[in-house]
Amino acid sequence: MAKQRILNKKSMDFLEAYLNNAAPTGYEWDGQKLWMDYLKPYVDEFITDTYGSAVGVINPEAHYKVVIEGHADEISWYVNYISDNGLIYVIRNGGSDHQIAPSKVVNIHTKKGIVKGVFGWPAIHTRSRAKEEPPKPENIFIDVGCKKKADVEKLGVHVGPMTVSSASTRFRALVWSCSYKRIKSKGVAMCSL
């Protein structure tokens, strides 16, 4: 009996597009649309709601149902204020872990497009050894390479519901450029870059 392939080019292309799509908490629609477009040939109907849920239904009249559930949003932040020296301070949007933020590359979504930045916090040589503080929402910031608040604002960044999402977790299939036969026999190596 021939084995049916689970991963093929179409499914890998979908997975890469889906995982690399920005879908911060409260703004999941683009990710859900990708998911629904991919599943359209396999389901009979979709149900969506104002909470960001998207459900694909197969055989809606069936007495018994099977649910496969997943979480669609990603970690994100809102711009809280911009300092005079061009550093951007943020607040959480959902359950973001500030402890892992320093040195993460981020995308700030603006009307002018994506602005790249990196999370920072006071350099080790500027921190008191007697009072070594861990990263906290109050002492971490995003640096976009500007020296003044006005320069940050010219990029389109402003205080308010601007979503900041991780840019350092790009999904790539490492061996997809190899022949499909190699992938089938060796499996697929994936990474977060």
Question: Where in this protein do the model-derived segments appear?
Answer:
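N-terminal hydrophobic/helix-forming segments and targeting peptides
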Residues: 1-193
